[in-house]
Amino acid sequence: MAFSGALTITDLDDFLTPSQACIIPVRNNKKPAEDEGPTEIHIDSNNNYYEVSTYPSVGHDDDIGNSKKALEKAEINLNDCLACSGCITSTESLLITMQSQNEILEFIKTNPTVVDPESPCHKPRLPILSISPQTLASLSAAYATASSRPPIPLLVLLRRIRAFLSQPEKGSWRVWDTTFARHMSLRESVVEFHERKDKKEKGKAAEMPMLASACPGWVCYAEKAQGDMLPLLSAARSSQGIIGALAKSWYGHKLQHKPDEIYHVTAMPCYDKKLEASRSDFYSSLYSTRDVDCVLTTGELDLLLQELGFDPHVPIANESTPSYSATEDSPFPELLTHEGSSSGSYLQTIIHDVQRSHPNPTRIITREIRGSTDNIEYLIQDTITGQIVFKGAKVYGFRNLQNLVRKVAKETGIGRSGRGAGAGKLSAAVAARRRKAKTAAPAATSATTSAEGTDVESIASLSLVSGEDKKLDFVEVMACPGGCVNGGGQMKPTVPTPSAPEAMEVDEEGYQRPLPDDGVAVAVNGGSNNVGTGTVAGMEEGMRWSTKEWVAKVEDIYWTGLPTPPASPPLTASNVNGFAPQVKTNGTTNGQVNNGVDRNLQSDQLAEEIIHEVCGDDASKRWDFMRTRFRKVESDVLSSGGVTHEAVKW
């Protein structure tokens, strides 16, 4: 099992092997009665525990067992763990393994496909499987590698899985993808961004920059270690949160099914999504059910399909025929494309909205921070006035995430009460670098004015200076390096088998894991990765159990047959200081028009209809349907002694 780095890095018992022993004692909030006397604990032959009074009752001088009371067994569930900062690898990792392909197989066995007339009380639950596009891309890459065939297009693979699982003997599943839910999440993110921006422009206290919250690993880290930054997190539900609400609240109502009469499963690229599904905001106390009953990782879905006998290369009728509206198989448009990143395109959606709403033409300028494609800044510049109207960033991986936390704390003042002595020196160094850039920029401009194309370079160089002073407006944050396509639950690359069988590691899903467990194999100068050896040349920390080549392959398949996102800018002479100017107008850039049908516009209309059907004009219902809340976790271990995670010295 592979949690994101943001989850495991914050805990003191990070190197302990998984254990069922929780380090936090179970609290008993029940107050003893005032007239209670001394008691003893008795254990019977069946290992049941009883509390027995040592005072004999009237008329029972020799019988002290008449007042015994059965004791309830103390239990710790996933909700308790999410509200505790004591550990994460030792308890939650065991509890979330209960959500696996074995649970789905058991459900298929016990859930009748038709109503039993002799058992009218036992109504079968309607099974729904929602698959993320990152999962489909990873499965396609794995199937192509195993069979030496071309990758299966995502739409074709989705429909083959749907046709297979819809068979009665396989469970009669409804199989969807999650891109329409992502579309609704992106729309809500734009609405929330405007709300915050309007508050800021009116001079009110606004929680800026807005930080994307679709990554549960980042959210869990923020709640447990960076609680002061929670107001900055976007309240918009992730695609999983919204598809869960759609399945239980909207689709179930259309079919006259109560929420507890639907069994909803999602297939996601990471284990952390299991934690997200267990949050209290996604639980209905009225029906005692969650929006998502079980979360499978990509690897677990693959194991499930294997056990059921799925052959991904068996074609079905009309598998490649595009659909432009909701069908009987899927009530939502299939596999919507959102230009930007394979991790949800949250930043790109905000950028497009800013460009459309700005009165003048704009250009996008990008810069890789320290040459990393996982840490890129985006500036939107007014081409007429030269003003920087927006500054955003894409931040993937825990190392970059920590730098982001420090940067945001510096810009906003959040969580800076405990600044160390070195903070002032760092600020002075940053200020000196900015002064140097400002004085050097005019010289660079005048020295290159005669060269062809240097007007663009000069603008980019000057924009770098003004961009340094501009504060962040929005950040797309993901805990995994490479984003969601490199999630811990994705399919893993095939590697050479070592000669000694005992040298091969096997993870919980049964996959062989010969790669070093704390790095990514990177070929050097075209050489081999030396997989299976004790060391790997050019190993990059963070991309656990994967390689850059494999992640790039999954990324490529993700966009196969879809509009390709803008490539990361190369560091060339025409790309001064790592900036790549891209001139854009205010026209729509990410619309999908097929046979005269704008799929995104069509999806916008469907989203509005669904929200109105579920919420009506009730703003409170709409908020609960589309958004969520975050809660700062007060540490039972560290904070009780006045020590924070950041103050711990290793």
UniProtKB/Swiss-Prot annotation:
Binding locations of [4Fe-4S] cluster 2: C215, C270, C480, C484
Pfam families according to UniProt: Fe_hyd_lg_C
Keyword Iron in record: yes
Keywords of this entry: 4Fe-4S, Iron, Iron-sulfur, Metal-binding
GO MF assignments: 4 iron, 4 sulfur cluster binding; iron-sulfur cluster binding; metal ion binding
Gene3D superfamilies linked to this entry: Fe-only Hydrogenase (Larger Subunit), Chain L, domain 3
Coiled-coil spans in chain: none
Keyword Iron-sulfur belongs to the record: yes
Binding-site residues for [4Fe-4S] cluster 1, renumbered to this chain: C22, C81, C84, C87
InterPro entries per the UniProt record, alphabetical: Cytosolic_Fe-S_CAF, Fe_hydrogenase, Fe_hydrogenase_lsu_C
UniProt record, GO biological process: iron-sulfur cluster assembly
Superkingdom, natural source: Eukaryota
Gene Ontology CC, one term: cytosolic [4Fe-4S] assembly targeting complex
Function recorded in the entry: Component of the cytosolic Fe/S protein assembly machinery. Required for maturation of extramitochondrial Fe/S proteins. May play a role in the transfer of pre-assembled Fe/S clusters to target apoproteins.
Family, per entry: Belongs to the NARF family.
UniProt protein name: Cytosolic Fe-S cluster assembly factor NAR1
Native species: Cryptococcus neoformans var. neoformans serotype D (strain JEC21 / ATCC MYA-565)
